[in-house]
Amino acid sequence: ADHARKELTLNRSMEFGGPGLNSLSADERATLCNMATECSARTGICEADEVLFNRMEMRMPHLNMVEQRLRAVAPDEGAVYHGGVHHIDLSSIRPMVAHPGNPDEGIPSDPTNGAYVNEIGDVSIDIAYGGSCTAGKIDDIAYYAQVCQAAKDSGRTVRDGVEFYIQYGSGVVKDVAVSKGWHQ
C-alpha cells in the first residue's frame, strides 16, 4: 500500500478527509487516527465536520458549539503534503482478519497485512478475541455483537471449549456493552 510506506509517513501527521470520512463514526475516526502510528506516523487527524461537532456537543455540553465551529481549521487550498496526497476508494476495501499475535503477518500485498476473510478457509478456533486499545470502543463492540447475533441467527454455534475474550477500551464501554446485552 503506497500510502502507508514508511518513507512517506515516518514522523509525519496523517490527515484524513474527503467524502469517505462522512461514512465513519467518531469512534471509527478515533481508531483510524490511533492506527496512524502503526505505519510510523506521529499522529493522525481528521477534518472537522458535523460528526465531530455532534460528538463534542454530546460529550461536552458546556462548550459553545458556535464558537467551536468557528475555531475549526481546515487545510489551506493548495497545501503541500510531503508524504503525498493519497486517494483511497473505501468501497474497494475488503473485510480483513489479522493473524493472532502478529497483525503484521499475512498476505503481503494487502494494505493492512491481514488475511482476506473469504480466503481463510476452514480454521480450527480455540480462542476468539475482539477489541484492543484502538478497537475497543462502543461502535467496535456493537459490531462484534452484530456479527455474533448474525451467526447465532443463521444457526451457527461455538464449539465447546472455545474461549472468547473482549477487550474493552474503557470501563464506560464495558458498562454500555453489559447494559445492552452485548457482553453476554
Predicted regions: what they are:
Residues 1-184:
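Fe-S-dependent hydro-lyases/dehydratases of central metabolism
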